[in-house]
UniProtKB/Swiss-Prot annotation:
Main location: secreted
Carbohydrate attachment residues: 48, 84, 247, 298, 443, 718
Catalytic activity: Hydrolysis of terminal, non-reducing alpha-D-xylose residues with release of alpha-D-xylose
GO cellular component: extracellular region
Protein name: Alpha-xylosidase
KW Hydrolase (keyword) present: yes
Alphabetical UniProt keywords: Glycoprotein, Glycosidase, Hydrolase, Secreted
Enzyme class: hydrolase
Entry similarity comment: Belongs to the glycosyl hydrolase 31 family.
Xref: CDD domains: GH31_N (cd14752), GH31_xylosidase_YicI (cd06593)
Disulfide cysteine pairs (residue numbers): none
One Pfam match: Gal_mutarotas_2
Function: Catalyzes the liberation of alpha-xylose from the non-reducing terminal glucose of xyloglucan oligosaccharides.
Length: 780
């Protein structure tokens, strides 16, 4: 939100009380409390003006929080994000009348407490080093309380004065050339500088500035991240009001933010997920291909069976089949009952699908239409969000007369999850948790008294948590996942998430990728898009290009709106492309499971921006049409019918030993780091480059992701190995568990150097793993 007109003027009706002085402070163990006020000329300036209390804490090492409070008399009805904390890792030094230093790990906050010289400076540096690097901070006029007399609130008489709408404002410094990223799944420009962003979940598709998944956390190229700990609406002006600052404002009396330090983007993400929760793992079968009924298409048992037979006849591997909205009768979403006209024997039919070896997914949302038999029950028992007068909140957008389930009511949660458990008893393996963005936030009440405005974003988290925990209670953590559209802070604990409603265009394919890369910067390690696009019918060329991209995402789903996405309706050559892409992804399962386990521990996503993997190469920071798929594979999707694609190959430390990137499809084709390349590809290839010095476990014998990874296991080694490498082979049945640790190294032989791979527990059997050594030496 913008409050100024240039450097000198304020917008009409705006007043800002800027904090310029530390009136007093108190140090209590790991906490510093300061009372801030305006510029003080004499004692009279303490009257008729605002103060802001600042509380400095450190929830975890390397993270420092500042909480700003104007009025402290408000009700705290929640909700609050769940954050992990520890103690005993801070150091505080205080030079009276001059400064205060608050240290947490390498991160230090230096507060200038000299009269009328208030400044906060966050710096980083190694222990014992005098020279420290500034990350961000508050300089002149950057902490304030804003009053707006133009809002409806200001027209209401409150006591003897008219009340202004208040906002708490914090402006954080930026350095020259600094770039900003993240803030959830955002589909606009990948680099966020110059943008105005509202953290407010909306159902806006992928071609707008709105977002389904708003996360008030951004990462800076300067070596830090900022998390605004506020579940309600957060407004950020990222160099779009003050060109040297990020302006953060929230409606109301308090604002809390945390600065998270890291040597590189991966360390920042690790600390971020230490604070907000580690991403959960998903079952191996979920990495396979998903097929859906699409949205508004007419389908029945016969339609679905025909699709599945078509996949079998064409030797197209399929892991999951999904029933979208119209598995239920129209106007009755959700009643959790199969439409008997279309599925007269739902239980029997689901059993027959399971006999095909398929996992089954089904669509749900957190709403109950008035025509649903469940509406009267929910109304009678108080399971829905209510208006202030006690009536059920309803509207006609989406489902006629629909109500919204109140997940702050434990009884409502039990009622809702009881229907999910019944569906799981029928054979449903997972749920697509759609919607939860259009949540009312005015003139309503929740069962637990939560603040409606703070619940608007948080609601999606509750919804997904309730469904996910229902699944884990029955199937266990290693066999549970969602397919969710909306989320909030901490939602990485309830995977997977997909990009929402995109158009069937190359532009939408590119914006989907931007959204997925941005979301990954919040520790969401799994992500998918609607292959082929959701809105409209994709031309065959686009379908094939999106298949290539979609099968190089962590999760891969064929889904549309009014048209089906089975490949043969776009041409039999589309089936060939799909088959090749699915089989390639299945062969990569050992690699993907190992990368996912690392992401579970560290918060590093499977699909990651180039700068995350190569922060020393400044050319990687603006790149948003290519990505790293795990640590080893560079992917550059093709965004044109003609197949022309331009991509950048980053410099890597490994290249100092004259190692080179190589093509996945042609191991004789080599690429130098630090260069741009333009190529033309048909539909059987795209740029997939293998990192120099990397060891990638693969298995071409696998027919499904959950197959035995050891039978047929091999490794692809690019170039020489400077030191012994350990590769974890993850159990596909329990993706938290490591089956074997493979040790890969070089050794001298009579015939020269060779690469060997040993599996722990396999005595003397060096040949149990096939080695495909490219770029150097011999193949064994």
């Amino acid at each position: 939100m913008k409050f100024t007109e240039g450097m000198w003027l304020l917008r009409e009706g705006i007043r800002i009380d800027w904090m310029s002085n530390v009136e007093r402070l108190n140090v209590d163990k790991d906490t510093v409390n300061l009372l801030l006020n305006k510029f003080q000329r004499h004692r009279g300036d303490t009257l008729n003006s605002s103060t802001v209390s600042a509380r400095v804490t450190s929830p975890l090492e390397g993270i420092i929080g500042v909480k700003l409070v104007h009025w402290a008399g408000g009700l705290d009805n929640g909700p609050h994000y769940e954050l992990n904390t520890s103690a005993g890792h801070t150091e505080i030094t205080h030079e009276k009348g001059k400064n205060l230093k608050y240290t947490s790990g390498r991160l230090e906050l230096d507060i200038n407490i000299a009269p009328n010289e208030l400044a906060f400076t966050f710096t980083t540096g190694a222990d014992g080093q005098d020279k420290r690097k500034k990350l961000t901070g508050h300089s002149f006029r950057s902490i304030g309380y804003v009053g707006d007399s133009t809002t409806p609130k200001s027209q209401l008489s409150d006591g003897i004065f008219y009340e202004r709408q208040g906002y708490t404002l914090a402006e954080l410094d930026l350095s020259v050339g600094e770039k900003l990223y993240g803030l959830g799944e955002r589909f606009g420009p990948f680099v966020k500088n110059g943008q105005s962003v509202n953290i407010w979940n909306e159902d806006g598709g992928t071609s707008s500035e709105l977002a389904y998944k708003n996360i008030p956390f951004y990462i800076s190229s300067n070596g830090y991240g900022v998390f605004v700990n506020h579940p309600g609406k957060v407004s950020l002006e990222l160099q779009s009001e003050r060109t040297t600052r990020v302006n953060v404002s929230v409606e109301g009396e308090e604002l809390e933010y945390f600065v998270i330090e890291g040597k590189n983007p991966k360390e920042i993400l690790k600390r971020w997920t230490d604070l907000t929760g580690k991403p959960a793992l998903v079952p191996a079968w979920s990495y396979g291909l998903w097929l859906t009924t699409s949205f508004t298409t007419n389908y029945s048992e016969r339609t679905v069976t025909g699709f599945l037979d078509g996949f079998k006849d064409r030797n197209l591997p399929l892991s999951v089949f999904h029933f979208d909205c119209f598995w239920m009768k129209s106007y009755q979403w959700c009643d959790f009952e199969f439409d008997a006209d279309m599925f007269p024997d739902a239980a029997g039919y689901l059993a027959r699908l399971k006999e095909r070896g398929l996992k089954l997914s089904i669509w749900i949302n957190p709403y109950v239409g008035q025509a649903s038999p469940l509406f009267e029950i929910g109304k009678r028992e108080g399971y829905f969000i209510k208006r202030i007068d006690g009536s059920v909140w309803q509207w006609d957008l989406w489902q006629a007369g629909m109500a919204v389930v109140d997940f702050t009511n434990p009884a409502a949660c039990s009622w809702y999850t009881g229907h999910l458990k019944r569906l799981m008893d029928l054979g449903i393996d997972t749920f697509k948790t759609d919607f939860a963005e259009r949540i009312p936030f005015k003139n309503i009440t929740y069962h637990d008294g939560s603040d409606p405005a703070r619940m608007h974003n948080y609601y999606a988290l509750l919804y997904n948590k309730v469904v996910y925990e229902t699944m884990t209670s029955i199937s266990g953590k290693s066999n549970s996942l969602l397919f969710a559209r909306s989320t909030s802070v901490g939602g990485q604990k309830y995977p997977v998430h997909w990009g929402g409603d995109c158009e069937s265009t190359y532009e939408a394919m590119a914006e989907s990728l931007r959204g997925g890369l941005s979301l990954g910067l919040a520790g969401y390690i799994f992500w998918a898009s609607d292959i082929g696009g959701f809105e409209g019918t994709p031309p065959p060329a686009l379908y094939k290009r999106w298949v290539q991209f979609g099968l190089l995402s962590s999760h891969s789903r064929l889904h549309g709106s009014s048209s089906f996405r089975v490949p043969w309706i776009y041409g039999e050559d589309c089936s060939d492309v799909l088959r090749d892409c699915v089989k390639r992804k299945i062969s990569l399962t050992p690699y993907l499971l190992a990368e996912a386990l690392n992401g579970h521990r560290s918060g590093t996503p499977l699909m990651r921006p180039m700068f995350m993997e190569f922060p020393e190469d400044l050319n990687t920071y603006p790149l948003d049409t290519q990505y790293m798929f795990g640590s080893n594979l560079l992917v550059a999707p093709v965004f044109s019918d003609e197949g022309i694609v331009t991509f950048y190959v980053p410099r890597t430390p490994e290249e100092e030993g004259r190692k080179q990137w190589i093509s996945w499809f042609d191991h004789g084709k080599k690429y130098e780091g630090g260069r741009w390349y333009t190529e033309t590809h048909g539909f059987d290839t795209l740029p997939i480059l293998i990192r120099p010095g990397s060891v990638t476990p693969i298995n071409y014998k696998l027919e499904k992701p959950e197959g035995n990874p050891l039978d047929g296991l091999e490794i692809l080694v690019n170039g020489s190995i400077d030191k012994e490498v350990e590769i974890e082979i993850v159990d596909p049945e329990t993706t938290h568990k490591v089956l074997k640790v493979m040790t890969v190294s070089e050794r001298e032989t009579e015939n020269g150097v060779e690469v060997i791979a040993r599996l722990d527990g396999v005595d003397g059997n060096e040949n149990s793993v096939k080695v495909n050594w490219v770029g150097h030496g011999v193949t064994k």
